[in-house]
A protein has these predicted regions:
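Extended, subdomain-level signal for the structured scaffold at the beginning of enzyme domains
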Residues: 1-125, 140-156, 164-221
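Short helix-loop-beta connector
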Residues: 128
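Short, thiol/selenol-centered motifs that function as redox-active sites or metal-ligating centers
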Residues: 134-138
Length: 221
């Protein structure tokens, strides 16, 4: 059975992994007959956001691995224990966690940093030419990782000019795309879809993510 790593960044759109995107990806992996292997870094979140008010919950702390375990129903690994040889493909759901906890894109834009274990695993995947999928805002993080790579990726976050502009400053090429579709970079084996960066409904987002996961699995030798 093919093993698909799913890198989570917490639990909740404003400070962690986007829950709809994560669950849709997990469902699509299962429907395709593959096994999802959930993982997350064992670090504190950048901050905690009250999802009712949208305001920062001052003084509160949450751990990315512990929060991600909610989505994974407890079946989750510390990303530091995972190597590229352990899995066949990799998926990064979106949500602000990808831009706050897996990277600092939400704060630093094109000058962001990427969590060292995320950076390591993606670079291992690139070296082994294994396929990866990035959803929603996660392509911005991928653009940073590939900033110094000889082959720059083609990515999509939909059609947001500010974010796509930052992706292109980092050297990647942005391609506009609807939430119901995906962009395939065959050379780098990276599939991306806008998800909630553009989608207005869960069904619209699901269509794009399901297509993305199916395309990702096709790329596995």
């Amino acid at each position: 059975m093919k093993k698909i790593g799913v890198v989570l960044s917490g639990c909740g759109v404003y400070d962690g992994a986007e829950i709809h995107e994560s669950v849709i990806a997990l469902l699509a992996i299962d429907r395709a007959g593959a096994q999802a292997v959930c993982m997350a870094p064992n670090v504190d979140q950048m901050h905690v956001v009250n999802h009712v008010t949208g305001e920062e919950a001052t003084g509160e702390k949450r751990n990315v691995l512990v929060e991600s375990a909610r989505i994974a129903r407890g079946e989750i690994k510390d990303i530091s224990t995972v190597k590229a040889e352990d899995i066949d493909a990799l998926v990064f759901p979106g949500g602000f966690g990808a831009a706050k906890n897996l990277s600092s894109f939400a704060v630093k834009g094109e000058n962001c940093d990427v969590h060292p274990e995320v950076l390591r695993l993606v670079k291992e995947f690139a070296a082994k030419q294994k396929p990866q999928a990035v959803l929603c805002i996660a392509p911005a993080m991928m653009a940073k990782i590939y900033e110094d790579a000889p082959k720059k990726p083609v990515l999509t976050i939909g059609n947001d000019k500010e974010t796509s502009g930052k992706i292109e400053i980092m050297g990647s090429r942005h391609q506009d795309c609807s939430a119901r579709d995906f962009v395939l970079d065959e050379e780098n084996k990276i599939v991306s879809t806008p998800a909630y960066m553009l989608g207005q409904s869960i069904s619209e987002v699901a269509e794009g993510i399901e297509k993305t996961i199916n395309e990702l699995i096709k790329l596995i030798p």
